[in-house]
């Protein structure tokens, strides 16, 4: 179990490499949307691509586990904490690049930047095409790894290429080189997304803003965004909606410990204050079991689990 505030030999070793901000025994709950879970043995923010590669090389040589913490949305940290290295890429680690022509444009942003940054840069250059990503929490790196999206589109619809760091260096992969599917992508083993290039087009920015404003308004009305939250909890099964199935199973508003199935949207969990990762994971498991019993559907969690669960 990782103890908060305790500096281990690993944290000291990483500090000796230089080029990184290292926090030993750092509580991770404040860095996740659900505000639950334990601490990181070593939370590391690399200050350069070279420092990131050096970290990955150290981890490979010494058999140290590496976890990636993006924006903390849909991420559940175990109450026992996260051993090894927990990497968090700063949003400004890489410069933004805009290559905009008369009819189209390519935007390259760092993977540690929030998804909303893409939306803002897109609008600044009078580009359209990624409206469906507006309002999705998390980082661009997380959007790549989860192929984030809504009913109106998915990230890989507008991704042209991704840059990935491994212990052997940094290189670009085209979209064709990254297998992806609904809420999933397959990156090289041990790889960390560092930059993302988006292919967009010139268009009606007024209409684009209207679409995004409508989507954001709908989210605010139907999702528990004013509370520490976790969602969507499950991917939608083919031809149905996870929230409908959970509500049909009688679990909307159901609580386990201090975690509750949202009364606004049954495919979300909220932290009522003081919830543990055990509470949240127990509720996820219960939702899955009840829906299977009620409707015969084996729902797939849209959850990234990090660390040790007690």
From Swiss-Prot:
Stored InterPro entries: FAD-bd_PCMH (IPR016166), FAD-bd_PCMH-like_sf (IPR036318), FAD-bd_PCMH_sub1 (IPR016167), FAD-bd_PCMH_sub2 (IPR016169), MurB (IPR003170), MurB_C (IPR011601), MurB_C_sf (IPR036635), Oxid_FAD_bind_N (IPR006094)
Cofactor entry: FAD
MF annotations from Gene Ontology: FAD binding; UDP-N-acetylmuramate dehydrogenase activity
Keyword hit for Cytoplasm: yes
Compartments it resides in: Cytoplasm
Enzyme superclass (EC): oxidoreductase
A Gene Ontology cellular-component term: cytosol
GO biological process assignments: cell division; cell wall organization; peptidoglycan biosynthetic process; regulation of cell shape
Record-annotated active site: 183, 232, 302
E.C. no: 1.3.1.98
Name under which the protein is recorded: UDP-N-acetylenolpyruvoylglucosamine reductase
Organism: Myxococcus xanthus (strain DK1622)
């Amino acid at each position: 179990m990782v103890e908060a505030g305790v500096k281990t030999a690993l944290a000291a070793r990483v500090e000796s490499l230089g080029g990184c901000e290292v926090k030993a025994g750092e509580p991770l709950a404040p860095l996740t949307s659900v505000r639950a879970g334990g601490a990181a043995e070593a939370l590391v923010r690399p200050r350069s691509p070279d420092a990131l590669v050096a970290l990955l090389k150290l981890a490979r040589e010494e058999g140290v586990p590496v976890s990636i913490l993006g924006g903390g949305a849909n991420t559940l940290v175990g109450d026992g904490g996260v051993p090894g290295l927990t990497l968090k890429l700063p949003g400004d680690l890489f410069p933004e690049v805009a290559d905009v022509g008369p009819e189209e444009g390519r935007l390259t942003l760092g993977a540690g930047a929030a998804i909303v940054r893409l939306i803002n840069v897109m609008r600044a250059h009078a580009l359209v095409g990624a409206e469906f990503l507006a309002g999705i929490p998390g980082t661009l790196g997380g959007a790549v790894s989860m192929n984030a999206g809504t009913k109106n589109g998915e990230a890989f619809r507008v991704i042209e290429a991704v840059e990935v760091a491994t212990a052997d260096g940094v290189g670009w992969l085209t979209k064709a080189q990254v297998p992806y599917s609904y809420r999933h992508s397959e990156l090289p083993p041990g790889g960390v997304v560092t930059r993302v290039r988006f292919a967009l087009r010139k268009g009606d920015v007024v209409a684009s803003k209207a679409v995004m404003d409508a989507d954001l308004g709908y989210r605010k009305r139907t999702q528990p965004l004013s509370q520490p939250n976790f969602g969507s909890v499950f991917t939608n099964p083919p031809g149905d909606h996870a929230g409908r199935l959970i509500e049909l199973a009688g679990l909307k508003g159901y609580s386990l410990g201090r975690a509750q199935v949202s009364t606004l949207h049954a495919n979300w969990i909220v932290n009522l204050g003081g919830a543990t990762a055990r509470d949240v994971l127990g509720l996820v498991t219960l939702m899955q079991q009840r829906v299977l019993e009620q409707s015969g559907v084996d729902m797939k969690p849209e959850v990234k689990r990090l660390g040790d669960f007690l």
